[in-house]
Amino acid sequence: MIGRLRGVLTSKTPPWLVVDVCGVGYELEVPMSTFYELPNVGYEVNLFTHYTQKDDSAALYGFLSESERRLFRHLQRVSGIGTKIALAVLSSVSVDTFAGLIQAGDVNALTVIPGIGKKTAERMLVELRDRAADFNNGISTSGKLNLDTVSEAALALQQLGYKPAEAARMARDAGTESDDVASVIKKALQAALR
C-alpha cells in the first residue's frame, strides 16, 4: 500500500503526526522513540510506513527506520499482541536492545515494557526467537542493557519533570551495560543540556 512517505511535517502531537505530501496530509501514529527524533514542524521528514485496516477503521503507522517497521510487523504476528503493545515496545526499547533480549531469552527484562506480562513475554520469546535476525541485522547480545536500571533512571527523570516517553528515551540512550542508575541519570541530563 503506502510503504514510505517523504514530506513536510505539518502537525506533531504525541503520538500523532501529519505529513504533507504534495498537498495531501497523511495522519500517522508513531512510537515515542520516533516522535522525539523528528524535526520541528515545517521541516521535511522521511518515514517508513505500515498500513492496517480492520473492519471499519484504517490506520497508518510511521517509523524512522526499516528495522523499526520490521520489528513492528513481527510483533503483530505474535498471538495476543496488537498495534498498541507493538508501539509500546518500540517506545520503550531500541530494536537492538529488544533483539538482544529475545536472543538472550530474558523474560524478566521484557516484562518491564508496558503492557507485557510474563505470559506475553514467554510467548514472544517462543514466537520471535527464530526471527530476531530478520528485524535487526548484526545483533549483538554482549552489550545488553539492564532494563531495571534504565527504568529506575527513567522514573527519576520523570520526577525531574520530563514526560514519561521522553524520560524513557533519555535513559535508554544514555545507559550502557556497566552503568548504575546514578550514572545513567547524570549522562542523560548532560546529553539534554547539549
From Swiss-Prot:
Could you tell me the Gene Ontology terms of the biological process aspect for this record? DNA recombination; DNA repair
Q: Hey, which family's this protein in?
A: Belongs to the RuvA family.
Q: Which Gene3D superfamilies match?
A: 5' to 3' exonuclease, C-terminal subdomain, DNA helicase RuvA subunit, C-terminal domain, Nucleic acid-binding proteins
Annotated segments matching region Domain I:
1-64
**Oligomeric and partner information:** Homotetramer. Forms an RuvA(8)-RuvB(12)-Holliday junction (HJ) complex. HJ DNA is sandwiched between 2 RuvA tetramers; dsDNA enters through RuvA and exits via RuvB. An RuvB hexamer assembles on each DNA strand where it exits the tetramer. Each RuvB hexamer is contacted by two RuvA subunits (via domain III) on 2 adjacent RuvB subunits; this complex drives branch migration. In the full resolvosome a probable DNA-RuvA(4)-RuvB(12)-RuvC(2) complex forms which resolves the HJ.
InterPro entries linked = DNA_helicase_Holl-junc_RuvA_I, Hlx-hairpin-Hlx_DNA-bd_motif, NA-bd_OB-fold, RuvA, RuvA_2-like, RuvA_C, RuvA_C_sf
Gene symbol of the encoding locus: ruvA
Entry-linked SUPFAM superfamilies: DNA helicase RuvA subunit, C-terminal domain, Nucleic acid-binding proteins, RuvA domain 2-like
Q: What does this protein do?
A: The RuvA-RuvB-RuvC complex processes Holliday junction (HJ) DNA during genetic recombination and DNA repair, while the RuvA-RuvB complex plays an important role in the rescue of blocked DNA replication forks via replication fork reversal (RFR). RuvA specifically binds to HJ cruciform DNA, conferring on it an open structure. The RuvB hexamer acts as an ATP-dependent pump, pulling dsDNA into and through the RuvAB complex. HJ branch migration allows RuvC to scan DNA until it finds its consensus sequence, where it cleaves and resolves the cruciform DNA.
Q: Which UniProt keywords apply?
A: Cytoplasm, DNA damage, DNA recombination, DNA repair, DNA-binding
Q: Where is this region: Domain II?
A: 65-140
Task: Quote the record's domain comment.
Answer: Has three domains with a flexible linker between the domains II and III and assumes an 'L' shape. Domain III is highly mobile and contacts RuvB.
Where's it found, cell-wise? Cytoplasm
Instruction: Look up keyword RNA-binding and say if it applies.
Output: no
Q: Recorded GO terms, molecular function? A: ATP binding; four-way junction DNA binding; four-way junction helicase activity
Q: Has keyword DNA damage?
A: yes
GO CC annotation: cytoplasm; Holliday junction helicase complex; Holliday junction resolvase complex
So which domain of life are we looking at? Bacteria
Provide the residue span(s) of the region labelled Domain III. 145-194
Return the annotated region ranges for Flexible linker.
140-144
Q: What is this protein called?
A: Holliday junction branch migration complex subunit RuvA
